[in-house]
Amino acid sequence: MNQTPKLNSFRAGPDEDGRFGIYGGRFVAETLMPLILDLQEEWEKAKNDPAFQAELKSLGTHYIGRPSPLYFAERLTAELGGAKIYFKREELNHTGSHKINNCIGQILLAKRMGKTRIIAETGAGQHGVASATVAARFGLPCVVYMGATDVERQAPNVFRMKLLGAEVIPVTAGSGTLKDAMNEALRDWVTNVDDTYYLIGTAAGPHPYPEMVRDFQAVIGTEAKQQMLEAEGRLPDLVIAAVGGGSNAIGIFHPFLDDESVKIVGVEAGGKGLQGDEHCASITAGSPGVLHGNRTYLLQDGDGQIKEGHSISAGLDYPGIGPEHSWLNDIGRAEYVPIMDHEALEAFQTLTRLEGIIPALEPSHALAEVIKRAPKMGKDEIILMNLSGRGDKDIFTVAKILGM
């Protein structure tokens, strides 16, 4: 899966308690602890089981369509006049994003554990669609919790999930977004621990989820590294990805962490600006706290109450971030920067116009940062960006904003 990291490696975490430095861990209700420990034990076995890995690889090839291509964005590179820009085309995967990589891995684990019901949370709907897809593929019932706000703004994905046989439950609590959906899913899990598997979509949650999701997503960076060596004979100077919970980002970052020549940048949702509360930049404007089973950077007020964030992109609309990202930020191995809604929207239009690729609003945030950085870099330098999802789900949102 991932080659074994060397000692003193940035890739060695988490420790046996699921911690990356002071982040991560397992902050869960007592009723869930036996289940979490059971999950960890099964995950350790599966990781080292050649049959599990072979099935995962086969489904990756024949069902997801891996490896995803590495694409040189020739016209975008020419327009910006600086570094060469490459995209890892995760939006070409089955279901249209990176989410399927993790879902296939986790459903194989659920089957292994004898679970007969799948639950999931979703923001943009991409993880919900991927969960409903793998549940259909393996003949298991699936319930997807989705914030009522997101149900409204991601209608095409809601329809897809229902077509795939999933039950979509709109969550009206809080601001009706991803955080609230995750709270409801955790409640369901506590109630139905015996037969239910909670398929978490991002690299957050209690240990072993952040590690497990990362390992299933690391196929992105592992492939990209190989493809980059084939295309350019060397590694990129900069690897960049959008960060909500952070699974697409950790998937492309992780295999490069020990390559000191490679700069790593995660792009957070700056929303309408960092002055107010209408953003989801947990690292840039948040502070460490505990949410959804792990310690990490969160958007919280002085009393530790979780704030309701905002982003034009439903998939980045989460008031926290995966614990490994928090650790990478604190040790200085990765840098995290915000991009505003309007910048992401401009980047979305630029890519569509120049390359004939309609990106999701999530990777449009990463693209906006690429557009800022590329002109300041030399023409002999290389940027690798994770194009984590396609924009079919966002065309109505964008059309509304642009008055089309």
From Swiss-Prot:
Enzyme Commission number: 4.2.1.20
Biochemical pathway: Amino-acid biosynthesis; L-tryptophan biosynthesis; L-tryptophan from chorismate: step 5/5
Pfam families in the record: PALP
EC class name: lyase
Cofactors: pyridoxal 5'-phosphate
Reaction catalysed by this enzyme: (1S,2R)-1-C-(indol-3-yl)glycerol 3-phosphate + L-serine = D-glyceraldehyde 3-phosphate + L-tryptophan + H2O
SUBUNIT field: Tetramer of two alpha and two beta chains.
Designated name of the protein: Tryptophan synthase beta chain
Organism field: Rhizobium rhizogenes (strain K84 / ATCC BAA-868) (Agrobacterium radiobacter)
Lineage: Bacteria, Pseudomonadati, Pseudomonadota, Alphaproteobacteria, Hyphomicrobiales
